């Protein structure tokens, strides 16, 4: 009885002790687990088979297994651990933690992920979390991503949740991790302190690698890592900024003792760089400013700027001064252009460029641009004061006006409906040649410095037809003032496919114009063409045949024009053409041989207009063309003719670029065609023999030869010989052209030679000599050094022709291009080499 009482008392004491101990545990953690083990007299608890433990501060820990020591107040959790603090808005994921409750410190082992304030994602390992201080720390490589797609890679870090301050070493910052490495910027720092909330930072040993297309090039971003730059590309443009330290506050980033270059990585110094005491980037103004800056060429300072600025790479357009340009000319002297660019609105801008010459000439050039949804307008005008022409005793003002306007009309039922307007006007005939280097906008500058063209043009087309109409005014910049203009107003061209079937295709075209030229010579033409072109059909013997039927209705009237009468005329013309060829092929071990004899029989029962005073070059390439005399607008080639030709080609089976080809062709007719152009070579019953030879069977040689042999086979009236030799880095081309007899009277030889020393250096030489006059027309000698970001060359030019204000000249130019900054060209003083 006494023993039973003792046992009962002992059990009661144990139960009371357990209840007291369990109450203490609950004060620290509230366990919600599937299975629990209690050992060591109730001091140790082990939770099994997944569950959670919630602290008295509301921290909830989920895990597969828990171990809690009541005496030390340390909680261990293992297996798919999740720590969630909904009050302070952070979540941690790992597989192994130790939670020292008395110190409110959590240690993780292995890979650890954290989501802070629902916008900062941490990926690290072996992390220490100080709950009271709200700080995360790790000495392992870590990755941090924010809601703005910025990624921070650090060899170690410390992060204050409350302040949003991230501290670390060997830091790599990626501007937009959602993009691939080709399209994002990269920043590296030795040490740094970053405020993730305000984006302020202070860092040492700064290196900024911009994506390669930052300045318009489409090269890919080279790979960069924290340990070395061994994998960096050595032959691509790689814009970057290095600095001793950097900081950012209130949208202002400052790089101290900075160096900027866009050159690719190499073993030595970059070809060019800008070294500044301070580089400041103002994100509000989108502007980069350099203080006390030196422009270095291969580490040699060549220019000093107390201060200069330019728009940052995000800016497509920003008002401000553009890079000056220096020019030199024997006629105009030395000049400097100082462009100022002004943004009027999102789609409008203005560039004003004053140019100052040391010869008291002044030039002001203005360009206005406007781009709308369906149109684009650009106008460039300039006025020059103080220039004295050799043809005038006075210093007169001269000017130019160039304009271009394109409008998409977006008319229904048309795939394209476009209006184009172009205006070209100068007040001095040699203006385009003399002021060539001073004209800024090359987009609307006339392509031909000997003539101008202004026009208004409409274009419409769909799947089966196209229509063009407009007016045009052309001016040649030589000759008398009265005869230099040509007015074509209006003109039109219409083409359509009427239909097609298994036999061929019907086409219709119509064109017309009024052409006033040579002061009072007027021609008006309305031309309608209907033709049928058959499909190719083959005979059982292997002949390939086709035919064409061409009808033309020509309506004309003229004044002081020999081919048109002064009263309205209407004519109907026709041309019939039959072509046949017999293609043959023979295969050898290494070559394929092709032979194709070809015949064209054509008949025009009517007459053609007189084109004997015009010019037309016939060769083996165009002799089978229906309009081989280029008279299709007004006539068909008159009479009956047979054109016979043959082509032989020998082609390498393994390399189609290695071949030998020869073409021969001639025209035979029943009577002379005196209305054909005098130099055509097909006026007589038996025409010249036209031929061409191409020889490219050898690795290093290419021979191209065109010729025209008179019908008696006595004289070669046309020779055009081109020989190209290429061996490794050496290339030379010789071209000889000779015209005799009916073809013309000229004789010239030209040479172009290039030698590429390596990928960065080459030399070029070009010359042409007129053997008819025994005069050399020009010499060009150029040496160029070029890499991904710098191009420097020396040009020697010598010309022997004279054109009013232009005189024979000898010049040496030195130019250097620093991508993406500017191009500078300077003429070398003649006293230095004469």
Q: How would you label these PLM feature ranges?
A:
Residues 7-8, 15, 61, 68, ...:
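A generic signature of intrinsically disordered, low-complexity regions enriched in glycine/proline
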Residues 24-257, 273-281, 286-292, 352, ...:
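N-terminal amphipathic/hydrophobic interface segments
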Residues 2-28:
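Classical Sec-dependent N-terminal signal peptides that target proteins to the secretory pathway
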Residues 197-210, 215-261, 267-268, 273-274, ...:
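Outer-membrane beta-barrel proteins and related beta-barrel translocases across Gram-negative bacteria
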């Amino acid at each position: 009885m006494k023993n039973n009482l003792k046992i009962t008392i002992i059990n009661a004491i144990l139960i009371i002790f357990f209840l007291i101990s369990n109450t203490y545990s609950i004060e620290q953690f509230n366990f919600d687990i599937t299975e629990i083990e209690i050992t060591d007299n109730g001091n140790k608890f082990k939770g099994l088979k997944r569950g959670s433990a919630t602290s008295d501060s509301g921290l909830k820990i989920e895990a597969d297994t828990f171990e809690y020591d009541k005496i030390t107040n340390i909680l261990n959790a293992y297996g798919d651990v999740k720590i969630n603090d909904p009050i302070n808005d952070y979540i941690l994921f790992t597989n192994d933690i130790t939670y020292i409750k008395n110190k409110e410190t959590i240690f993780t082992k292995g890979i650890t992920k954290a989501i802070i304030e629902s916008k900062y994602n941490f990926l690290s390992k072996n992390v220490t979390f100080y709950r009271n201080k709200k700080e995360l720390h790790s000495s392992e490589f870590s990755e941090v991503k924010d809601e703005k797609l910025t990624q921070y890679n650090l060899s170690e870090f410390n992060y204050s949740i409350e302040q949003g301050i991230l501290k670390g070493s060997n830091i790599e910052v990626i501007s937009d991790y959602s993009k691939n490495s080709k399209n994002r910027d990269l920043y590296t720092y030795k040490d740094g302190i970053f405020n993730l909330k305000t984006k302020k930072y202070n860092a040492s040993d700064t290196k900024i690698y911009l994506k390669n297309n930052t300045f318009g090039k489409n090269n890919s971003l080279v790979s960069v890592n924290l340990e070395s730059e061994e994998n960096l590309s050595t032959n691509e443009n790689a814009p970057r900024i290095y600095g001793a330290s950097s900081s950012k506050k209130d949208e202002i980033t400052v790089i101290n003792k900075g160096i900027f270059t866009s050159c690719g990585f190499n073993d030595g110094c970059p070809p060019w760089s800008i070294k500044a005491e301070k580089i400041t980037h103002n994100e509000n103004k989108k502007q980069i400013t350099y203080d006390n800056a030196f422009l270095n060429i291969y580490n040699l300072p060549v220019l000093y700027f107390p201060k200069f600025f330019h728009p940052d790479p995000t800016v497509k357009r920003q008002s401000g001064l553009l890079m000056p340009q220096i020019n030199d000319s024997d006629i105009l002297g030395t000049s400097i252009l100082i462009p100022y660019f002004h943004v009027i609105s999102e789609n409008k801008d203005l560039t004003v460029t004053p140019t100052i010459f040391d010869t008291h000439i002044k030039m002001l050039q203005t360009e206005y641009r406007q781009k709308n949804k369906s149109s684009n307008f650009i106008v460039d005008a300039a006025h020059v004061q103080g220039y004295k022409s050799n043809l005038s005793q006075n210093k007169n003002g001269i000017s130019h006006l160039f304009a271009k306007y394109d409008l998409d009309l977006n008319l229904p039922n048309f795939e394209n409906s476009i209006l184009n307007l172009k205006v070209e006007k100068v007040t001095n005939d040699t203006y385009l040649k003399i002021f060539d280097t001073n004209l800024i906008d090359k987009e609307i500058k006339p392509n031909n410095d000997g003539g101008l063209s202004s026009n208004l043009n409409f274009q419409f087309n769909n799947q089966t037809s196209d229509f063009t109409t407009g007016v045009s005014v052309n001016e040649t910049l030589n000759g008398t003032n009265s005869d230099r203009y040509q007015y074509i107003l209006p003109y039109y061209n219409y083409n359509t496919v009427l239909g097609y079937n298994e036999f061929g295709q019907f086409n219709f075209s119509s064109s017309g114009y009024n052409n006033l030229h040579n002061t009072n010579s007027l021609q008006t033409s309305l031309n309608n063409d209907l033709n049928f072109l058959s499909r190719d059909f083959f005979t059982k013997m292997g002949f390939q045949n086709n035919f064409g039927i061409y009808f033309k209705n020509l309506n004309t009237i003229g004044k002081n024009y020999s081919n048109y009468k002064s009263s309205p005329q209407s004519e109907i013309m026709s041309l019939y053409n039959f072509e046949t060829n017999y293609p043959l092929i023979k295969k050898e071990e290494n070559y394929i041989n092709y032979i194709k004899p070809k015949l064209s029989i054509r008949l025009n029962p009517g007459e053609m207009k007189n084109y004997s005073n015009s010019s037309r070059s016939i060769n083996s390439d165009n002799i089978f063309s229906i309009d081989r005399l280029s008279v299709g607008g007004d006539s068909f080639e008159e009479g009956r003719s047979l054109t016979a030709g043959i082509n032989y080609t020998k082609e390498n089976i393994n390399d189609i670029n290695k071949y030998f080809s020869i073409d021969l062709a001639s025209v035979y007719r029943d009577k002379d065609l005196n209305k054909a152009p005098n130099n055509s070579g097909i006026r007589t019953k038996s025409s010249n023999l036209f031929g061409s030879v191409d020889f490219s069977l050898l690795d290093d040689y290419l021979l191209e030869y065109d010729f025209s042999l008179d019908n008696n086979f006595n004289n070669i009236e046309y020779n055009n010989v081109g020989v190209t030799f290429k061996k490794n880095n050496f290339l030379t081309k010789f071209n000889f052209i000779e015209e005799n007899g009916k073809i013309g009277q000229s004789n010239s030889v030209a040479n172009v030679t290039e030698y590429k020393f390596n990928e960065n250096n080459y030399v070029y030489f070009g010359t042409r000599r007129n053997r008819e006059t025994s005069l050399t027309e020009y010499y060009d000698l150029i040496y160029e050094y070029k890499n991904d970001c710098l191009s420097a060359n020396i040009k020697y030019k010598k010309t022997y022709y004279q054109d009013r204000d232009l005189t024979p000249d000898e010049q040496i130019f030195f130019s250097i291009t620093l991508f993406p900054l500017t191009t500078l060209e300077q003429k070398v003083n003649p006293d230095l080499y004469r």
